[in-house]
Amino acid sequence: MAQQTPLYEQHTLCGARMVDFHGWMMPLHYGSQLDEHHAVRTDAGMFDVSHMTIVDLHGSRTREFLRYLLANDVAKLTKTGKALYSGMLNASGGVIDDLIVYYFTEDFFRLVVNSATREKDLSWITQHAEPYAIDITVRDDLSLIAVQGPNAQEKAATLFTDEQRHAVEGMKPFFGVQAGDLFIATTGYTGEAGYEIAMPNEKAADFWRALVEAGVKPCGLGARDTLRLEAGMNLYGQEMDEGISPLAANMGWTIAWEPADRDFIGREALEMQREKGHEQLVGLVMTEKGVLRNELPVRFTDAQGNQQEGIITSGTFSPTLGYSIALARVPAGIGETAIVQIRNREMPVKVTKPVFVRNGKAVA
């Protein structure tokens, strides 16, 4: 039996089409995925992301523990509320999960991890935390709502108290603050400005209804996927998993190689991959008719004249751009063009950086 978030009833009242998403009943859309997508790019939309897991870590050695657990380095986190994106890797350098870590005090950090990987994440974290005497609290008492779009912060702020408005005033991206009973973070998964707001479960339904009244459009998983793909953001299980290195998933920037004496899980394997060479994640654009879909083969001839083949990890029609885009994992050495096999047709595609839209504007 699939689980329900505290907002399940609100979704049905808003006319959502519900689907089972990794064991959670979640809204796919509320009538028009396209309208929801455009609302986030041009105004404000909101997503129930309460299926994600918030994990609080307490203990005097929490920073030391996270410097070992994560490929990125929490030594960078010195300002209260600052957030960091990182992979959590296994010994062979594969990605167990990608997550966000927040720093509050030396003995209090917070992780936000994916729903699909919840059980293995918690098991892995608990196993490795033991020598560091970390107190781990899974915050199943909290719901999480993402409000995203150019007008999202302004509309969300109409629900805040004076204290909360003051707390978020001038807050830069990738920060979070606890203000009253809300944890408000300037993070998201759409390429737009906005907030991700955690609150007690019993407050979530009222907060959702108030956002609807403030003119924020409910959005489902369908729009969430096209928005994150336009923004070039990875989806766990597609761009990366336990068998795929962050180096092959456009996550090289999340690996803190310095200081060289910091030991983190997967470091040795990554150093070997870096020396030997590895696959890369690229963007693909197809302006001709048709849609680039997951798992389609991508072919190109490298500089040595050898035929090479990769695979599309995520593909869709881009509502913002009006043509098809994709992320693809390919061997090193791809040029500016490639061929994608769609049924029995070979379609030419342009190879780009793996990001297509930022703040509502085309970058590909």
UniProtKB/Swiss-Prot annotation:
Entry's EC annotation: 2.1.2.10
Pfam families: GCV_T (PF01571), GCV_T_C (PF08669)
SUPFAM superfamilies attached to this UniProt entry: Aminomethyltransferase beta-barrel domain, Folate-binding domain
Keyword set includes Transferase: yes
Transmembrane spans: none
Reactions listed under catalytic activity: N(6)-[(R)-S(8)-aminomethyldihydrolipoyl]-L-lysyl-[protein] + (6S)-5,6,7,8-tetrahydrofolate = N(6)-[(R)-dihydrolipoyl]-L-lysyl-[protein] + (6R)-5,10-methylene-5,6,7,8-tetrahydrofolate + NH4(+)
Cellular component, GO annotation: cytosol; glycine cleavage complex
Keywords in alphabetical order: Aminotransferase, Transferase
InterPro entries given in the database record: GCS_T, GCS_T_bac, GCST_C, GCV_T_N, GcvT/YgfZ/DmdA, GcvT/YgfZ_C, TrmE/GcvT_dom1
A Gene Ontology molecular function term of the record: transaminase activity
Record-stated family: Belongs to the GcvT family.
Name used for this protein in its record: Aminomethyltransferase
Species per Swiss-Prot/TrEMBL record: Salmonella newport (strain SL254)
Originating gene: gcvT
